[in-house]
Amino acid sequence: MYSLEELKSFLKKRLSKKRFIHSLNVADEAYKLAGMYGEDPDKAYLAGLLHDVCKESPTAEQEELMLKSNMNISGAELSTKALWHGPAGAYFIKSELGINDSDILNAVRYHTIGRSGMSKLEEIIYMADLISDDRDYKDVDKMRKLAYSDFERAMYEACLLYTSPSPRDTERS
């Protein structure tokens, strides 16, 4: 297994500066949320750090990794390239980085789409991605406060945010 510093160095080379900073911000947010909500902060930090490991990979590579993963990929995911980096990233983390922790793999896998019955760690990564310091969409401050005061309500609001028919500037990355 790689050390945290080795993984940061790897990501710094692999990702754009903006995406690397975003990954660090998500990791920091996940660490804080995990501590508050009874999850392992170090595990949350690692999942947050790695959540976008394949976000900037070529589309063909993302598709190949996603299909190799043998994960249950929905038709909606297959038809939406912007979602491929979740399952591709989970497979990459397992096959290339040797991380086999199913909690981390699922948190990365579902960080863009969520799912019914998400674990607390999956929810934390989902939320950390939404409220990280680099986010600046309308009402992000409200979501940040809610995430630390009423996590279940924050998850509910997050689901509404992404299923609402009105366009919102929240770019999931």
Question: Over which residues does each language-model region extend?
Answer:
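Non-catalytic interface/linker regions that flank or bridge core catalytic/transmembrane domains
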Residues: 1-2, 168
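Divalent metal-dependent catalytic cores for phosphoryl transfer on phosphate-bearing substrates
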Residues: 6-13, 31-159
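Conserved small/polar residues in nucleotide/adenosyl-binding loops
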Residues: 162-169
